[in-house]
Curated annotation (Swiss-Prot):
Gene3D superfamilies from the UniProt entry: S-ribosylhomocysteinase (LuxS)
Record-given protein name: S-ribosylhomocysteine lyase
EC number: 4.4.1.21
Cofactors required: Fe cation
Organism whose genome encodes this protein: Campylobacter curvus (strain 525.92)
Catalytic activity: S-(5-deoxy-D-ribos-5-yl)-L-homocysteine = (S)-4,5-dihydroxypentane-2,3-dione + L-homocysteine
Length: 171
């Protein structure tokens, strides 16, 4: 099994909140795709609550598109990490990490301004696979925590994992 890019960084020294350009690739037609690690919580120390993460997923996807999409840049997908410490965002185009951080900050402010559960997009049994598993209160707490801490830029080289030095193997 190949070692995935996300497992080549040392999670013990990764700061959060932070934006990390996790991967870039070219499509067969030459379009650039960037995958960003949007780390909300310091790995292995804290994680986002399940219901709040789900609500954030519904809100964050739209707000990030509002703030980041432009000519030559379009978000493909934003998905929560299984570890609940962040989201992965795939983008056509090459926004800078600072542009992503600015859009993320603006999105957190937008989320705080959502005042009612009824304002959460696609919150119904037809469009959501777990429509009862939401918490706007928890989403607000997550957004407030990000804004309070500030969003940094994470450099891949500074957190590169030396598998050999840590006694780890590639599987």
């Amino acid at each position: 099994m190949p070692l995935l890019d996300s497992f080549c960084v040392d999670h013990t020294i990764m700061n959060a909140p932070g934006v990390r350009l996790a991967k870039t690739m070219d499509t067969p037609k030459g379009d650039k795709i960037c995958v960003f690690d949007l780390r909300f919580c310091k790995p292995n120390e804290t994680m986002m609550p399940e219901r709040g993460t789900h609500t954030l997923e519904h809100l964050f996807a739209g707000f990030m598109r509002d703030h980041l999409n432009r000519e030559g840049v379009e978000i493909i997908d934003i998905s929560p990490m299984g570890c609940r410490t962040g989201f992965y965002m795939s983008v056509i185009g090459e926004p800078s990490s600072q542009e992503v951080a600015n859009a993320w900050e603006a999105s957190m402010k937008d989320i705080i301004n959502v005042l009612s559960q009824s304002d959460i997009p696609e919150l119904n049994e037809y469009q959501c696979g777990s429509y009862k598993m939401h918490s706007l209160k928890e989403a607000h707490e997550i957004a407030n925590n990000v804004l309070k801490a500030g969003i940094g830029i994470i450099d891949n080289e500074s957190i590169k994992l030396d598998l050999h030095a840590k006694g780890l193997k590639k599987h």
